[in-house]
């Protein structure tokens, strides 16, 4: 994780009196990478997310806890998450809230503004930003996602064509991420 993000996370945990533990995943990641052929940023990010989740599930088993999901509706609809990584959880209280709604909810809860203003990032590699990777702000994305859900043809027709193309492509390409694995019975 980025040092500033780690510092912020620790500060938030301490201010809320939450138990926390920091585990350095780089040695685990390095061991995996040494066994892999040419690894791009996407594969490295997915691997990092899966290592994090493996450690979270192990720690939850040790402590008798449940892993809480943090993926929101925008990320889920776009497939902007890693199967068995950040998408894995026992339950997800914010899974039906769009990213822009999360910002509003955070304000309502009194989350310090510095956290609300932070650029959304999985922090999988240096300089990574959701909106940079997606090419659009979540406010724009969410407006279109909500219009698509309501079949608001006027809003859809007025949407930026590149945004519409990106959203439709991601929804179609990543739909499988929103389903449980297929189980073949009684074939």
Model-predicted regions and their roles:
Residues 28-31, 118, 166, 170:
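Short acidic/histidine-centered micro-motifs embedded in hydrophobic/aromatic stretches
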Residues 1-77:
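ATP-dependent adenylation/nucleotidyltransferase module used to activate substrates
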Residues 87, 128-187:
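Peripheral terminal appendages
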Residues 2, 40, 112-114, 153-164:
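Short, structured coil/loop segments at alpha-helix boundaries
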Residues 14, 44-52, 66-140:
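Catalytic subdomain that performs nucleotidyl-dependent activation
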Residues 18-21, 114-116, 153, 176:
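Secondary-structure boundary/capping residues
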């Amino acid at each position: 994780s980025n040092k500033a993000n780690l510092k912020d996370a620790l500060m938030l945990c301490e201010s809320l009196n939450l138990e926390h533990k920091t585990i350095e995943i780089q040695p685990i990641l390095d061991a995996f990478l040494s066994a892999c052929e040419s690894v791009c940023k996407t594969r490295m990010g997915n691997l990092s997310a899966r290592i994090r989740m493996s450690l979270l599930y192990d720690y939850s088993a040790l402590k008798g806890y449940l892993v809480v999901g943090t993926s929101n509706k925008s990320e889920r609809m776009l497939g902007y998450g890693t199967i068995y990584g950040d998408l894995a959880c026992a339950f997800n209280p914010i899974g039906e809230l769009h990213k822009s709604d999360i910002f509003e909810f955070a304000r309502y809860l009194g989350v310090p503004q510095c956290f609300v203003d932070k650029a959304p990032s999985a922090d999988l590699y240096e300089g990574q930003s959701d909106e940079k990777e997606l090419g659009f702000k979540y406010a724009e994305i969410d407006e279109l996602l909500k219009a698509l859900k309501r079949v608001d043809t006027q809003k859809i027709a007025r949407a930026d064509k590149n945004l519409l193309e990106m959203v439709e492509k991601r929804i179609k390409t990543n739909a499988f991420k929103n389903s449980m694995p297929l189980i073949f019975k009684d074939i």
